């Protein structure tokens, strides 16, 4: 029972860490990355469709993304969707391809993005702590029903705290990496 609670908490904490890493991968840095356009939704014959289903996105150079749209008639719709996003990008058509140059980030914008990333990190830490609280509550319920001893309760809480500390350490490491990436010129 306790091992199931521990495993469940471990899996949920790992999901929190992965969700945070996925979230911050979408924050624009000075470098081009195809994941930057993952959140772009294009109107495809009246249906909102993710860009990655309609085109391939590759890195042309460190500051340019190249989009190869599968259906040529969608070029203007893709450009419009990118411009409408809050990424501050201006795509340009070049025949069948669309190129998206990434402008250099200003110091002010970098600091703003760091604040956003730190806010995301705090949200992820709260999620990890909520998982810890849920696991500890389940163990306390077992103790209350006299299914486990107080020693098992204490041991389980210590294990869950170690998992929490490890997950928060991973979050902090990912945050530090992203901050360093954002501050590079």
From Swiss-Prot:
UniProt superkingdom: Bacteria
| Biological processes annotated in GO | cytoplasmic translational termination
User: What keyword terms does UniProt attach to this protein?
Assistant: Cytoplasm, Protein biosynthesis
**Cell cycle: is it a keyword of this entry?**
no
Task: Kindly list the places in or outside the cell where this protein is found, as annotated in its UniProt entry.
Answer: Cytoplasm
Molecular function in Gene Ontology: ribosomal large subunit binding
Q: Where is the signal peptide?
A: none
**What's in the GO CC field?**
cytosol
Among CDD domains, the record links this protein to: RRF (cd00520)
- Protein biosynthesis among keywords: yes
The record's comment on protein family reads: Belongs to the RRF family.
HAMAP family attached here? Answer: RRF
**PANTHER family linked to this entry:** MITOCHONDRIAL RIBOSOME RECYCLING FACTOR PSEUDO 1, RIBOSOME RECYCLING FACTOR
- State the protein's purpose: Responsible for the release of ribosomes from messenger RNA at the termination of protein biosynthesis. May increase the efficiency of translation by recycling ribosomes from one round of translation to another.
Could you identify this protein by its name? Answer: Ribosome-recycling factor
Which source organism does the UniProt entry give? Enterobacter sp. (strain 638)
């Amino acid at each position: 029972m306790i091992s199931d609670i521990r495993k469940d908490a471990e899996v949920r904490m790992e999901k929190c860490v992965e969700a945070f890493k996925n979230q911050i991968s979408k924050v624009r840095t000075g470098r081009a990355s195809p994941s930057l356009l993952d959140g772009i939704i294009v109107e495809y014959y009246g249906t909102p469709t993710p860009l990655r289903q309609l085109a391939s996105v590759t890195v042309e150079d460190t500051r340019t993304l190249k989009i190869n749209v599968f259906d040529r008639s969608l070029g203007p719709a893709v450009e419009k969707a990118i411009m409408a996003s809050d990424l501050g990008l201006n795509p340009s058509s070049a025949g069948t391809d669309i190129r998206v140059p990434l402008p250099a980030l200003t110091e002010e914008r970098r600091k703003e993005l760091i604040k956003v990333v730190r806010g995301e990190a705090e949200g992820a830490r709260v999620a990890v702590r909520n998982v810890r609280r849920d696991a500890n509550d389940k163990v306390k319920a077992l103790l209350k029903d006299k299914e486990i001893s107080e020693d098992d309760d204490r041991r389980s809480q210590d294990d869950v705290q170690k998992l929490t500390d490890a997950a928060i350490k991973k979050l902090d490491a990912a945050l530090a990496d992203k901050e360093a990436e954002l501050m590079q010129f």
